[in-house]
Design a protein with these regions (language model features):
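A residue-level detector for conformationally permissive "hinge/kink" positions
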Residues: 15, 31-34, 39, 73, ...
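Mid-chain, well-packed structural core segment of small domains
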Residues: 61-88
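HotDog/MaoC-like acyl-thioester-processing domains
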Residues: 1-6, 79-146
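Hot-dog-fold acyl-thioester-processing enzymes
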Residues: 1-66, 128-146
C-alpha cells in the first residue's frame, strides 16, 4: 500500500465549507474569536472532516466500492495551518470463494507527528481484482485496479 497521503494545509475556508456541507455549524470550527474565548488557541477541524480525509486514504487502496467497514477514534485536534498525513498498514488478509478481505489499521497524523485520528477499515474485492493488483501493484488507483 502507498506509504502516505498528505492533505492540507487545513484552512479556515475548508472548515467553513465543511460546516456548510455537513450542517456542523459549531462556531468553534470557523469563528476564531469564539474559539479563543472558549479557551482554544483558535479554530480546529471538525472530527468528521478528519475522518473523511482518513477514509479517502483508506478507500484509495482498493477503490471506494471495496469499503465494507470504517471506524475511527479521535485523538487530538487539528488546527488551521496543520498538514495531516494518512498512513496505514495491512493487519489481516483472508480469502473466500467470493473475494479477498483486507483489514487496514489507519492513522492521520499532523506535521509534528501527533496522532489526530486512529482508524480501521475493512475492504473486500473480488479474487480476480486482488490477483491483478498483486501482480501489478502500481496499477491500484482510487477507482480500483485499472
Amino acid at each position: 500500500m502507498p506509504p502516505t497521503r498528505t492533505f492540507g494545509p487545513i484552512t479556515t475556508e475548508m472548515l467553513v465549507r465543511y460546516a456548510g456541507a455537513s450542517g456542523d455549524l459549531n462556531p468553534m470550527h470557523y469563528d476564531h474569536e469564539y474559539a479563543q474565548a472558549a479557551g482554544y488557541r483558535g479554530v480546529f477541524a471538525q472530527g468528521m472532516q478528519l475522518a473523511a480525509l482518513l477514509s479517502t486514504y483508506g478507500a484509495e487502496q482498493l477503490g471506494p466500492r471495496s469499503v465494507r467497514r470504517f471506524g475511527v477514534t479521535f485523538r487530538s485536534q487539528v488546527w488551521v495551518g496543520d498538514i495531516v498525513t494518512g498512513s496505514g498498514e495491512v493487519t489481516e488478509v483472508t480469502t473466500s470463494d467470493t473475494g479477498v478481505r483486507v483489514v487496514l489499521r489507519l492513522a492521520l497524523t499532523t506535521q509534528e507527528g501527533t496522532l489526530a485520528v486512529a482508524g480501521e477499515a475493512e475492504l473486500e474485492v473480488p479474487t480476480s481484482l486482488w490477483e491483478s493488483a498483486e501482480t501489478q501493484p502500481q496499477t491500484l488507483t482510487a477507482q480500483g485496479v485499472q
